[in-house]
Amino acid sequence: MVWEKEKIVGSCIVGGAAFAVGASFLHLFLKGELPLGLGLGLSCPWRILRKRKPVRVYMDGCFDMMHYGHCNALRQARALGDQLVVGVVSDEEIIANKGPPVTPLHERMTMVKAVKWVDEVISDAPYAITEDFMKKLFDEYQIDYIIHGDDPCVLPDGTDAYALAKKAGRYKQIKRTEGVSSTDIVGRMLLCVRERSISDTHSRSSLQRQFSHGHSSPKFEDGASSAGTRVSHFLPTSRRIVQFSNGKGPGPDARIIYIDGAFDLFHAGHVEILRRARELGDFLLVGIHNDQTVSAKRGAHRPIMNLHERSLSVLACRYVDEVIIGAPWEVSRDTITTFDISLVVHGTVAESDDFRKEEDNPYSVPISMGIFQVLDSPLDITTSTIIRRIVANHEAYQKRNAKKEASEKKYYEQKSFVSGD
């Protein structure tokens, strides 16, 4: 008699030896209909193998100006369980506890949902874990552990936002990603709009144009603050890139879609155009221009984030399969052949209209080959949009950053090693 290979559902111990059994065997045994000889001496306790309940972990945050540090935190949190549920704090809660957010809730939701390690998202999460909300997490969302980084999260009254979770024994800690924070990124932009640099010759609209299009930056008066520096403190490692990568290439007959750009201050507009691009094929390859190219095309103040920072932000997006770190400005025939590109795409919303030019068009080769397509951008957001928000409300952000810079300085002075990656 031939027994077909099937899913193992139980185990039995006979004569000191353990046997795994399938559904058909178990069914026949329970009915007493096993073939002659197979049932002899099989009087044993059955242990039905039940599917293990997945470990569900919860992490919340503002996720304002979402960057690769946020993504790395979510990656680490996901590694502590089987399913990651993320709470995104409401605009009202952020204003009450930290000051005005740069990106509204719907944009922050788009960003968090696009992170490849996120399984579920809760909108309008509270800034602090209350008794009621913690009970809701445990009962309704079946959360096993609440996760946060090793940097302190303190409420306006000085108390720990995660005190209740710690007291309940359901709290786990991850390592904060070094070298980046939303405060740091906003600070890089505020470098050009410090109060002392605003004069009759540097109106708000003038500053917006300078920052967005790369004119000479206003000079600081002696003693002016330069805390918000464009210099990144991020130290890239090959291990981090591997952690963010999918680790697999396209199949032999895959339709490969290519899209390129700076992807500076990675935002919801980027996410949505990448989603649209990915829908056109089997594998999405993203070319990320190097810092020199971005500066030459966008102006001296760009990019805000360096090449490695921008690459990690793009790699964390669930719609992206692979990136070219330091892609050429012009899409050449060699690039198309090397990566077996089927279609080159570009969104209608962009920092420049070079893709519409007849001369010096970086996409002239794919256009001539008939493999270039312009996609309607779902959102009218660019990096300049984010910068304009900062400039328009720079006084509020300077005040917010002053508080955060002080707390971050204290964190770095008092921090200790936390295991993890």
Swiss-Prot record:
Record bears the keyword Lipid biosynthesis: yes
Matches recorded under InterPro entries: CCT, Cyt_trans-like, Ect1/PCYT2, Rossmann-like_a/b/a_fold
Membrane topology: Single-pass membrane protein
Reported consequences of knocking out the gene: Embryonic lethality when homozygous.
Keyword annotations from UniProtKB, A to Z: Lipid biosynthesis, Lipid metabolism, Membrane, Mitochondrion, Mitochondrion outer membrane, Nucleotidyltransferase, Phospholipid biosynthesis, Phospholipid metabolism, Phosphoprotein, Transferase, Transmembrane, Transmembrane helix
Subcellular location: Mitochondrion outer membrane
Keyword Transmembrane: yes
Stretches for region Disordered: 203-227, 402-421
Catalytic activity: phosphoethanolamine + CTP + H(+) = CDP-ethanolamine + diphosphate
Tissue-by-tissue expression: Expressed in root tip, lateral root primordia, leaves, shoot apex, stem vascular bundles, pollen and embryos.
Amino acids binding CTP: 262-263, 270-273, 298, 346-349, 377-381
GO MF: ethanolamine-phosphate cytidylyltransferase activity
Record field: compositional bias (Polar residues): 204-215
Residue numbers of Phosphoserine PTMs: 416
One of the record's GO cellular component terms: Golgi apparatus
Residue intervals passing through the bilayer: 8-28
Pathway involvement of the protein, from the record: Phospholipid metabolism; phosphatidylethanolamine biosynthesis; phosphatidylethanolamine from ethanolamine: step 2/3
Family assignment from sequence similarity: Belongs to the cytidylyltransferase family.
Described function: Plays an important role in the biosynthesis of the phospholipid phosphatidylethanolamine. Catalyzes the formation of CDP-ethanolamine. Essential for early embryonic development.
Protein name according to UniProt: Ethanolamine-phosphate cytidylyltransferase
Organism, as annotated: Arabidopsis thaliana
Lineage: Eukaryota, Viridiplantae, Streptophyta, Embryophyta, Tracheophyta
